[in-house]
């Protein structure tokens, strides 16, 4: 019963989630601008934690994936350090008075992206847009995942959850917990309703090379989905305004 009630957020709850999202986005931008050659994931993570503390958020940890490690949604056990031309993926959370934000940014360090890096980044960016277009009040939550996945398959990824492609759900519910019902995953029949909150993170992963994940959370309104944070516009401006 409690979980059912928590699926729908009140205006006060949405305001706390907005505050957490604003802090999280600013902290990722801060860390990205201060990332240097040779840095470890732990050093980048420390930059994010420092920024969050300064801005008034509670840092709940993050996942920093560099180079080939970004090709696996949850990373690898190999040690990696930042090098020019490599992907840096930062997937981190923040809470304000117990309400969560979850944002991922992916950028190329120290140089122009390759044509393949740019293509995949643009495809994930498009995937976020497809998810938002599919997220309509009353439709099954799983239909959002289906819309993204069908497009990715038309681009040659998959099929379904196979790599290269997207091996995880398009999004998860978020609120007092980072991961809570309902999920944007194939087969989920729960209809979308105003006040529901989700991540939007249709990453693409190419084993042995790299991955790109862009993640912004949104909430459903009477007229459709609304982002808490604006997705960055391009790989050349990977943190946005």
Annotate each language-model stretch with its function.
Residues 1-241:
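Active-site neighborhoods and metal-handling regions in enzymes and metal-associated proteins
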């Amino acid at each position: 019963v409690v979980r059912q009630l928590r699926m729908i957020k009140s205006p006060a709850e949405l305001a706390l989630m907005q505050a957490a999202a604003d802090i999280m986005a600013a902290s990722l931008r801060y860390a990205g601008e201060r990332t240097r050659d040779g840095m470890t994931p732990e050093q980048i993570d420390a930059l994010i934690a420092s920024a969050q503390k300064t801005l008034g958020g509670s840092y709940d940890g993050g996942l920093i994936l560099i180079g080939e490690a970004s090709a696996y949604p949850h990373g690898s056990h190999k040690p990696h350090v930042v090098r020019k031309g490599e992907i840096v993926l930062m997937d981190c959370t923040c809470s304000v008075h117990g309400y969560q934000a979850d944002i991922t940014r992916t950028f190329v360090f120290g140089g122009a992206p390759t044509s393949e890096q740019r293509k995949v980044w643009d495809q994930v960016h498009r995937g976020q847009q497809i998810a938002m277009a599919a997220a309509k009040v009353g439709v099954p939550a799983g239909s959002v995942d289906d819309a993204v996945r069908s497009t990715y398959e038309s681009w040659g990824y998959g099929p379904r959850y196979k790599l290269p492609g997207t091996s995880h759900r398009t999004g998860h519910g978020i609120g007092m917990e980072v991961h809570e019902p309902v999920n944007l995953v194939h087969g989920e029949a729960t209809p979308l309703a105003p006040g529901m909150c989700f991540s939007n993170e249709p990453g693409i992963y190419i084993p042995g090379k790299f991955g790109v994940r862009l993640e912004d959370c949104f909430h459903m309104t009477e007229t459709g989905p609304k982002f808490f944070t604006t997705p960055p516009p391009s790989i050349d401006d990977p943190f946005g305004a």
